[in-house]
From Swiss-Prot:
GO molecular function: sodium:proton antiporter activity
NCBIfam families: NhaA, PRK09560.1, PRK09561.1, PRK14854.1
Keywords from the UniProt entry: Antiport, Cell inner membrane, Cell membrane, Ion transport, Membrane, Sodium, Sodium transport, Transmembrane, Transmembrane helix, Transport
Protein family per UniProt: Belongs to the NhaA Na(+)/H(+) (TC 2.A.33) antiporter family.
Membrane topology annotation: Multi-pass membrane protein
Protein name in UniProt: Na(+)/H(+) antiporter NhaA
Disulphide connectivity of cysteines: none
UniProt-listed GO biological process terms: regulation of pH
Source domain of life: Bacteria
An annotated GO cellular component: plasma membrane
Function comment: Na(+)/H(+) antiporter that extrudes sodium in exchange for external protons.
InterPro entries assigned to the protein according to its UniProt record, in alphabetical order: Na/H_antiporter_dom_sf (IPR023171), NhaA (IPR004670)
Subcellular location: Cell inner membrane
Amino acid sequence: MGASQKNQELIGGLILFSAALLAIVVNNSPLASYYAMLETINVKLGIENLVIDKNLMHWINDGLMAIYFLYIGLEIKREIIVGTLSKPSNIITPAIAAFAGLAMPSLIYLSINHDIKVINGWAIPSATDIAFTLAILALLGTRVPAKLKLLVITIAIFDDIAAIAIIAIFYTKSLSLLSLSLGTLFILAMIICNRIFKINRSSVYVVLGFFAWFCTIKSGVHATLAGFTTALCIPFRENDKDSPANFMEDSLHPWIIYFILPVFAFANAGISFSGISFSILFEPITLGIIWGLFVGKQLGIFSILAVFKKLKWFKLGESFSNLQLYGISLLCGIGFTMSLFIGVLAFNDTHLLNAIKIGVVVGSVLSGFFGYIVLRFIVTNPS
């Protein structure tokens, strides 16, 4: 990660944090009625009977986040072909750690929440926000070795893959087979353009990907799946920045960190304190998310990394201290963007959404704060 990219990640993280803070301020000020317009102003896209009519909040969550998942897909594809994920020996331990970091928070959430009305939120504390995590790593600078940062990114990538699968399997509320079939045809068209006709024009995949996204929304499957699937169909060539996948990943990166994620944070992080009391912190759904993110994530990930290192199954881990591994395990508990996103998919009740937002913010802040403290002040030999 070069110096300019480190600065981008740091600035992007600060903008993301500022957007979330601004949302809370605006939603608890005289401007709250304008903030509410995110859910009352509708925008239509399409012609005649082929129309998608959604409010601004849905366009942000279904549209902008689909672009974000397109970017994630491009990043994962590059890592699989030429990056860390291209070597099986590099991915086994991070993959198992990521799974443990998904399972443990979910189990903690379910152990606290027994009411059938809130069980659907089990996946909320299982996510990791790579944007915030990279911002803190950039802030730590040389205190975190490059290989340790790579380990965090690899775990986060598997976390993203799991999140995509969870959204597709557990948060699809209705299904139109006709629309899904049409979307699949556009995906197949991209594969044919790539593998058979060797088409390298990015615009072709953008157009076909748009139609796949449109059909996916109409099908009832969440649109983020179309973004991720489209990324896997786009041609990638090693050492060629002009290949469609490289070009699109580089082009999207600043838009993701400076615009899409901050807009998502502003739209979804607006906790309204009107009519709620301090006791909301102690409601089962809030506690389940806080403990899931802050305790479950670090417990699941660190236990795997430490045990595998002890058994000498994790060669890369031998160059790190247990404190370093514990510090990055804490950082993986920053669930912010992805946790909020899953929360919005799981519930639409205003009170529950406020509890979710508070739980996500508190759990993420605790994880980020203590992760920073461990890596910055407690780890004595960062090299």
